[in-house]
């Protein structure tokens, strides 16, 4: 069985701190934390979401 190098990452809204999204992140190619502007249902706006560990 092949071991997976992809890691599950949870994205958290910087304004309301709600955990809205979970994504698969390549552990070998991306060493920095993800920062993506996505829609937050709690804030009802597009806000910056950062990866948690």
From Swiss-Prot:
GO molecular function: structural constituent of ribosome
Membrane-crossing residue ranges in chain numbering: none
UniProt feature coiled coil, ranges: none
SUPFAM superfamilies from the UniProt entry: Zn-binding ribosomal proteins
Alphabetized UniProt keyword annotations: Ribonucleoprotein, Ribosomal protein
Family annotation (HAMAP family): Ribosomal_bL33 (MF_00294)
Similarity-based family: Belongs to the bacterial ribosomal protein bL33 family.
Name this protein carries in UniProt: Large ribosomal subunit protein bL33B
Species assigned in the record: Mycoplasma capricolum subsp. capricolum (strain California kid / ATCC 27343 / NCTC 10154)
Name of the gene encoding the protein in the UniProt record: rpmG2
